[in-house]
Curated annotation (Swiss-Prot):
One cellular component (GO) term of this entry: cytoplasm
Family membership noted in the UniProt record: Belongs to the class-II aminoacyl-tRNA synthetase family. Type 1 subfamily.
Pfam family, one: tRNA-synt_2
Annotated binding of ATP, by residue: 221-223, 480, 532-535
Transmembrane segments: none
Subunit organization: Homodimer.
Principal place of residence: cytoplasm
NCBIfam families xrefs: aspS_bact, PRK00476.1
EC number: 6.1.1.12
Name by which UniProt lists this protein: Aspartate--tRNA ligase
Entry's localization field: Cytoplasm
Organism: Streptomyces griseus subsp. griseus (strain JCM 4626 / CBS 651.72 / NBRC 13350 / KCC S-0626 / ISP 5235)
Annotated function: Catalyzes the attachment of L-aspartate to tRNA(Asp) in a two-step reaction: L-aspartate is first activated by ATP to form Asp-AMP and then transferred to the acceptor end of tRNA(Asp).
BP term (GO), one: aspartyl-tRNA aminoacylation
């Protein structure tokens, strides 16, 4: 018999009754019923019940051991009595009569329990992540991640893509978030950067003559944590294709996502084909560029209705309305509760009216609306008895942010929200540039390597804020899974694009020397995308936080509490790297959000 096991803990069934077995695993739980010990033994594959009767070697040994001790046991498979069968356990029809026990790894006092999902704070869980990963939910999430990545690889190869690796040590670049830098011992005073994304390398592969590239790529960004973004390191399905237009990129990715979410979605519906929603339409209808289409409500811009209104709360402001069917009969508590939710998201309040059976409007602001206002709103919003309407007024960005949150919450509270589905969409026609309202500076709104839709003519003739890029996002259930773009592969066009964003020719020629050199030696039209693997798994696992799907994530302050990283270097190491430290100074705007190349 094998030194440690003849079977795994999850594979024994009623057909194995009478078999002598050897198992190894962790002591998951123990119950003492009149001196008879019932032990749940756990390994990677499942759980099985052990029985150790009084006076047996197994009973004496197991009685002294703590939970999570690793043991090897010998015993015989026996059938459980009919009253003791556990139908929720694959091994629930059998148990193991223990004859021998060997301790392989004793466990001391545990910092938290493993066999329950109790309220242990995240910092504690990350400090003892190896224990946290023993929990059933976490173990299942990591195994789901493994299966998803394996499936992605298989499907990408079937779609005609080739997996290729790109460098981890590369050069820093001016676009995107902050780099993680690595000092070069052999080149004093110089630094490598860990790649924020393999952006330039995957484009260079297309210029090298390869046609369809993919990689499960590690990416590194020195940015703040969010629920859907882990600081430090993350993984993306990096994709690039030659001789393609936008729809050519959409087709294989849409097929991949549909098949992947169907395979691992546990019966949840996957909507296909994915609708294409222009960026500006998304901002107006949903309040953001990552709409949760499970919420079956849309915002309506009614700013013109109140442009010259006597109602000061709305007059001259950007005003967005949210009509909600079948809600007028809700209690005042419903309306007040949604108002409180809006305040929590930055609003000063939430104006509303409801439509009565006779078509008249009632509510806190009804008395401020003229007959013309009522008629226009009724027509514009297609109001009928039973409707309620919620209003947000103020600056465009502020109203968009608040009302996007209210839209989803109102849908959930009023019964207009779909459960058990994955609602995908493409967001297209992104603006190429944006203006910093404080400095007045024009900068790239997203990916600086995107092709402007009108080419060089647009860059030379149009207002930069009116230029659209061949850039797109794929969104699912309000989570942005990826950005992508058709690339700007023409040198002069690229230089002009950067010039508009304030980069002089010399800087661009220096920072992107490799790219420009390649573009000048025969570059094909190409484009790509990079869906986030961590976010895909987060959605499939139905987890609210991305760190629940990563084996060893950093905490919100980009610290590894288990390994103690980041660490200080001793003076000898610093001298070897030609580095001298100075007292840290808080950087102005250190926590400001950063643009990113692709996600």
């Amino acid at each position: 018999m094998h030194r440690y096991r003849s079977h795994t803990c999850g594979e024994l069934r009623a057909s194995d009754v009478g078999t002598d077995v050897r198992l190894s695993g962790w002591l998951h739980n123990r119950r003492d019923l009149g001196g008879i010990l019932f032990i749940d033994l756990r390994d990677h594959y499942g759980l099985v019940q052990l029985v150790a009767r009084p006076g047996t070697p197994g009973n004496d040994a197991l009685a002294k051991l703590t939970k999570e001790t690793v043991v090897r046991i010998d015993g015989k498979v026996s059938a459980r009595g009919a009253d003791n069968v556990n139908p929720e356990l694959p091994t629930g029809e059998i148990e193991i009569e223990v004859t021998e026990v060997e301790v392989l790894g004793e466990a001391g006092p545990l910092p938290f329990t493993i066999n329950t999902e109790d309220g242990v704070n995240e910092e504690r869980r990350l400090e003892y992540r190896f224990l946290d990963l023993r929990r059933e939910r976490m173990h299942r999430n990591i195994m789901l991640r493994s299966a998803v990545i394996a499936s992605i690889r298989s499907k990408m190869v079937a779609l005609g893509f080739n997996e290729m690796a790109t460098p981890i040590l590369t050069a820093t670049s001016p676009e995107g978030a902050r780099d993680f830098v690595v000092p070069s011992r052999l080149n004093p005073g110089k630094f490598y950067a860990l790649p924020q994304a393999p952006q330039q390398f995957k484009q260079l592969l297309m210029i090298s003559g390869f046609d369809r590239y993919f990689q499960i790529a590690p990416c590194f960004r020195d940015e703040d944590a969010r629920a859907d973004r882990s600081p430090g390191e993350f993984y993306q399905l990096d994709v690039e294709m030659s001789f393609v237009e936008q729809e050519d990129v959409f087709q294989p990715i849409e097929k991949l996502m549909t098949e992947l979410f169907t395979e691992f979605g546990n019966g949840r519906e996957v909507t296909s084909p994915f609708p294409r929603i222009p960026f500006r339409e998304s901002m107006l209808k949903y309040g953001n560029d990552k709409p949760d289409l499970r919420a079956k409500l849309e915002l309506v811009d009614i700013s013109d209705v109140f442009a010259d209104s006597g109602f000061k709360a709305f007059a001259g402001k950007h005003v967005r309305a949210l009509p909600v069917p079948d809600t007028a009969g809700q209690s005042r508590k419903f309306f007040d509760g949604l108002g409180e939710y809006a305040v929590e998201h930055g609003a000063k309040g939430l104006a509303w009216v409801r439509v009565g059976e006779d078509g008249t409007l009632a509510g806190p602001i009804a008395k401020f609306l003229t007959e013309t206002d009522v008629k226009t709103l009724t027509e514009r919003l297609s109001l009928v008895p039973g409707h309620a309407v919620f209003f947000g007024a103020g600056e465009f960005d502020e109203v968009s942010k608040i009302m996007s949150a209210v839209r989803v919450e109102a849908a959930k509270r009023a019964g207009h929200f779909e459960e058990g589905v994955f609602r995908f969409c493409w967001i297209v026609d992104f603006p190429m540039y944006e203006k910093d309202e404080e400095t007045g500076k024009i900068d790239f709104s997203h990916n600086p390597f995107s092709m402007p839709q009108g080419g060089l003519a647009d860059l030379e003739e149009k207002d930069p804020l009116d230029i659209l890029a061949w850039q797109y996002d794929i969104v699912c259930n309000g989570i942005e899974l990826s950005s992508g773009a058709i690339r700007n592969h023409e040198p002069e066009l690229m230089l002009k694009a950067f010039e508009i964003a304030g980069y002089d020719r010399e800087t661009v020629e220096h920072e992107f020397a490799g790219m420009l050199r390649a573009f000048r030696l025969g570059a094909p039209p190409h484009g790509g995308i990079a869906p986030g693997v961590d976010r895909i798994v987060m959605l499939l696992a139905d987890e609210p936080n991305i760190r629940e799907t990563i084996a060893f994530p950093l905490n919100g302050n980009a610290q590894d509490l288990m390994m103690g990283a980041p660490t200080e270097l001793d003076e000898s190491r610093l001298r070897e790297l030609n580095i001298q430290l100075r007292k840290p100074v808080a950087a102005k705007g250190a926590n400001a959000p950063e643009k990113t190349a692709e996600k």
